[in-house]
């Protein structure tokens, strides 16, 4: 668990990410990356036709099946699937923020500015605002290293 002195950094980073995230969720913009649209095509094929065509070689079936479940849930609940995809992406970003901060706490690091450099780097932000598997993969990779 994060100590109190580190907790504020998690909340600051997460709150700033949330404010950056708001326009994307309002516009239901799944991202500038073409891989996001390929992933969406895979999800729709899998859900509607029960046909798995990888979004890109070699395919990322775990994340594609996860999004297919969310797509089905959105149809069942009559919700917009882009919104649910983006919310799930944001949850992975928050999880990554939490685990990265735990690495700094585990090392008793006083260089917390490095945490902010990591979580506000352009590639971290861009991939966090696109419906793509980068943050999901990062989450499970960091979790494996942390545990």
Where are these regions (language model features)?
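Membrane-interface starts of transmembrane alpha-helices
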Residues: 5, 76-88, 110-114
């Amino acid at each position: 668990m994060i100590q109190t002195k580190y907790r504020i950094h998690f909340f600051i980073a997460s709150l700033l990410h949330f404010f950056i995230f708001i326009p994307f969720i309002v516009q239901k913009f799944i991202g500038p990356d073409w891989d996001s649209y390929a992933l969406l095509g895979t999800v729709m094929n899998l859900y509607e036709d029960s046909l798995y065509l990888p979004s890109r070689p070699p395919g990322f079936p775990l994340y594609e099946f996860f999004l297919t479940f969310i797509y089905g849930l959105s149809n069942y609940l009559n919700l917009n699937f882009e919104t649910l995809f983006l919310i799930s992406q944001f949850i992975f970003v928050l999880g990554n923020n939490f685990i990265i901060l735990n690495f700094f706490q585990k090392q008793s690091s006083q260089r917390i500015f490095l945490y902010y450099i990591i979580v506000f780097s352009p590639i971290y932000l861009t991939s966090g605002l696109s419906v793509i598997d980068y943050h999901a993969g990062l989450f499970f990779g960091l979790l494996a290293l942390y545990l």
